[in-house]
Design a protein with these regions (language model features):
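Dinucleotide-binding Rossmann-like beta1-alpha1 core, especially the glycine-rich loop
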Residues: 47-122
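Glycine-rich FAD pyrophosphate-binding loop
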Residues: 22-47
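Active-site/ligand-binding neighborhood in enzyme catalytic cores
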Residues: 85, 90, 99-227
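Conserved beta-strand segments of alpha/beta enzyme cores
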Residues: 27, 50, 75, 214-216
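Core beta-strand elements of the Rossmann-like FAD/NAD(P) dinucleotide-binding domain
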Residues: 2-3, 224-230
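Short glycine-/acidic-enriched loop or helix-start segments at secondary-structure transitions
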Residues: 17, 40-41, 226-227
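N-terminal Rossmann-like FAD-binding beta1-loop-alpha1 element of flavoenzymes
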Residues: 3-30
Length: 230
């Protein structure tokens, strides 16, 4: 059978491409290495809850055309990601914003927060210079030079070491290029205008995109090059 397009991978990109191609009367074959479609946004339904197996994934965009498109396939809720960190029984809002700084230091204005952060950064840099350190040698020194000691110790160090399975002093500084800081009272993790998660899970979105399109799972393209000749 002749296909116009062989699409490797049934994640969001591959599924949208197949959907758009089908709208133009192109015949597509989608092959997927895993035993399920959806790529990294695949959901497993556990006890009635759609669990993001490779997640979590929150859809966010400021492009109304993109937002209208995905909502034409499946309805999205208005989930807003506002994480909270628990450090020794005390809660802190993330990402770093004025709510975080109030919880940490009791400051209420951006100027107070900036002075606190800059003061800690200055002390850290002076201590490094006394030891003959010109540039941060590891992630710990890099993070402190960007955000100060308190935020690093409370909200970065433990999480990062758990994530990488190594001490921050053993990790290279380039892992953290920058640390976003907001001097406003806003706990929204993203800055985009439109945010949410598909009602019914991401599988519903992928199924809608791949409706009436031929899909083969458990097919590794690199081990099944014959699909190139279809």
């Amino acid at each position: 059978m002749k296909y116009d397009y062989l699409i490797v991978g049934s994640g969001l990109f591959g599924s949208v491409f197949a959907y758009r191609a089908k709208q133009k009367n192109k015949k597509c074959l989608v092959i997927e290495k895993r035993n399920h479609i959806g790529g990294n946004i695949y959901c497993e339904n556990i006890e009635g809850i759609n669990v993001h197996k490779y997640g979590a994934h929150i859809f966010h965009t400021s492009n109304k055309e993109v937002w209208d498109f995905v909502n034409s396939i499946v309805e999205f809720n208005r989930y807003t990601n506002s994480p909270i960190a628990n450090y020794k029984g005390k809660l802190y809002n993330l990402p770093f914003n004025m709510n975080t700084f109030y919880q940490m230091w009791g400051v209420t204005t951006p100027q107070q927060a900036k002075e606190k952060i800059e003061g800690q950064k200055l002390l850290a840099m002076e201590a490094m210079k006394k030891e003959g350190i010109i540039e941060p040698r590891n992630l710990e020194e890099q993070a402190i030079s960007l955000i100060g000691t308190d935020i690093y110790e409370i909200l970065i160090k433990g999480y990062t070491e758990k994530q990488w399975g190594r001490k921050c002093t053993e990790l290279p500084p380039f892992i953290i290029k920058r640390l976003p800081v907001r001097f406003i009272y806003d706990n929204n993790y993203f800055n985009d205008k439109y945010q949410g998660i598909p009602i019914g899970g991401y599988n519903k979105l992928i199924n809608g995109l791949l409706n009436d399109i031929e899909v083969k799972t458990d097919v590794d393209f690199f081990k099944n090059r014959e699909y190139c000749c279809l």
